[in-house]
Amino acid sequence: MLMLLVRGTRYENHRSKVTLPTPLGGRSNETTLCESPGPDTGIRWRRSDEALRVNVGGVRRLLSARALARFPGTRLGRLQAAASEEQARRLCDDYDAAAREFYFDRHPGFFLGLLHFYRTGHLHVLDELCVFAFGQEADYWGLGENALAACCRARYLERRVTRPRAWDEDSDTPSSVDPCPDEISDVQRELARYGAARCGRLRRRLWLTMENPGYSLPSKLFSCVSISVVLASIAAMCIHSLPEYQAREAAAAVAAVAAGRSAEGVRDDPVLRRLEYFCIAWFSFEVSSRLLLAPSTRNFFCHPLNLIDIVSVLPFYLTLLAGAALGDQGGTGGKEFGHLGKVVQVFRLMRIFRVLKLARHSTGLRSLGATLKHSYREVGILLLYLAVGVSVFSGVAYTAEKEEHVGFDTIPACWWWGTVSMTTVGYGDVVPVTVAGKLAASGCILGGILVVALPITIIFNKFSHFYRRQKALEAAVRNSNHQEFEDLLSSVDGVSEASLETSRETSQEGRSADLETQAPSEPPHAQMY
């Protein structure tokens, strides 16, 4: 039996001769077609001009050898030119020798666009796929960016560069803030580490109590106490700088020196010193507890919030070591300890970093950190624009005002004026007096407004996105049923990372089966392209 496929229509004939339509003004053409070897002959692999039967996610099509030969570098083009069955199997997911059909577990919607590419030579972007899924499919089938049609190339490149995830700046829809599966997998992987650990269940509960304020009532109380201690520490540091406390400490230091004692131990108010010790004890308890309860010590030291906790207590202990070193020198010190007192003051100044501990309990601060992390290009562009503008207008102002002796004596001295002018702060400590200098100042201010406004808009949009995303995650934790959350935690007892990988592969197979089930129904015969 012979089979002829013309534009998607199949014609069958049991004879070896098929009469084709007669050309205009010509004579009848009688062509003899050779039967292709059956799948069980075991003599030849495939004819070079034989149509390729493929099944992509449940969508079956027949592709002509002529269309595939136009693009030999693509996956289907290489499959058509495969010299053996083993070589062909390496290019597909499965092969049915009886039906001579190649199976691919890929997106069926993209495959329909791929068929259009083999007909026209141009690939169009599909709105049903995100830019990264579309790029992965294109790479799998061996298509590059040059294959994109001119009408879709600019849109694809813009979405790939500026929109890592499709989100609308003015929309609060859940699709713009949904957590990705990678975040959920990271949480499951962290929880799975407690399965094989000693006292894993207890450590897991304590870790969630300290890390997740919405986990239980004790976790909320712990969060409130932590915030109160941070605020008390910051308030004590600010009160310590008031003039009356400075005068009191100076008088106590003079009295100690007059009595022949060291002045190092009397420079702090007793109440503030006790409050400082209490705050340091609480911060040390937090750091040590999180370190002992953390599922991974390596990940603990890689987390920015944990590094902030360490920095908040490190200056206190360094100050104690420096004080002990000064005490060993009898309070006078040697040449090598001449500037150690200034180093101690620097360590005390580092206490201001404790305010960053509020980021663990503040959605806005965490969103700001994520924004700066993902906006380093925009921040770099902003600094570059400011540097160029300050350099140019500082030189112009120096040239116009150097004879007036009003503070524009050197170009580096003009940098301060250029910075406060471009950022539209304008302290007024240094102002131009000549007409040329005032024109330069006007251009500097207008240029600063334009230069600063352009990147700030992009950074603000990213901050809004990350803030809404973080609020949505916190709302999901608050609204989740506590018993269901406990069941989820119980389900990961004893689960290893290997089992998580196995479950992930199983879920991918399930999604592939769903694609086959949801694929559009096909006629009994395959269509030819």
Curated annotation (Swiss-Prot):
From its record, what is one biological process in GO terms? protein homooligomerization
Which domain of life does this protein belong to? Eukaryota
How is this protein positioned relative to the membrane?
Multi-pass membrane protein
Please give the residue ranges the record marks as intramembrane. 412-423, 424-431
Topological domains, Extracellular: 240-270, 323-340, 399-411, 432-438
Protein location: Cell membrane
- Please indicate the ranges of residues that lie on the Cytoplasmic side: 1-217, 294-304, 362-376, 468-529
Motif Selectivity filter in this chain: 424-429
| Region of interest (Disordered), residue spans | 494-529
Report keywords, A-Z. Cell membrane, Ion channel, Ion transport, Membrane, Potassium, Potassium channel, Potassium transport, Transmembrane, Transmembrane helix, Transport, Voltage-gated channel
Q: Name one GO molecular function term.
A: potassium channel regulator activity
Give me the segments passing through the membrane.
218-239, 271-293, 305-322, 341-361, 377-398, 439-467
Per UniProt, the ranges with Basic and acidic residues bias are 502-514
A single GO cellular-component term from the record reads: nucleoplasm
Can you state the subunit structure given in the record? Heterotetramer with KCNB1. Heterotetramer with KCNB2. Does not form homomultimers.
Give the function comment from the record: Potassium channel regulatory subunit that modulate the delayed rectifier voltage-gated potassium channel activity of KCNB1 and KCNB2 by altering their kinetics, expression levels, and shifting the half-inactivation potential to more polarized values. While it does not form functional channels on its own, it can form functional heterotetrameric channels with KCNB1 and KCNB2. Each regulatory subunit has unique regulatory properties that can lead to extensive inhibition, significant changes in kinetics, and/or substantial shifts in the voltage dependencies of the inactivation process.
Q: What is known of its domains?
A: The transmembrane segment S4 functions as a voltage-sensor and is characterized by a series of positively charged amino acids at every third position. Channel opening and closing is effected by a conformation change that affects the position and orientation of the voltage-sensor paddle formed by S3 and S4 within the membrane. A transmembrane electric field that is positive inside would push the positively charged S4 segment outwards, thereby opening the pore, while a field that is negative inside would pull the S4 segment inwards and close the pore.
The UniProt family comment states:
Belongs to the potassium channel family. S (TC 1.A.1.2) subfamily. Kv9.1/KCNS1 sub-subfamily.
UniProt name for this protein: Delayed-rectifier potassium channel regulatory subunit KCNS1
In its UniProt entry, the species of origin is given as: Saimiri boliviensis boliviensis
User: Gene that codes for this?
Assistant: KCNS1
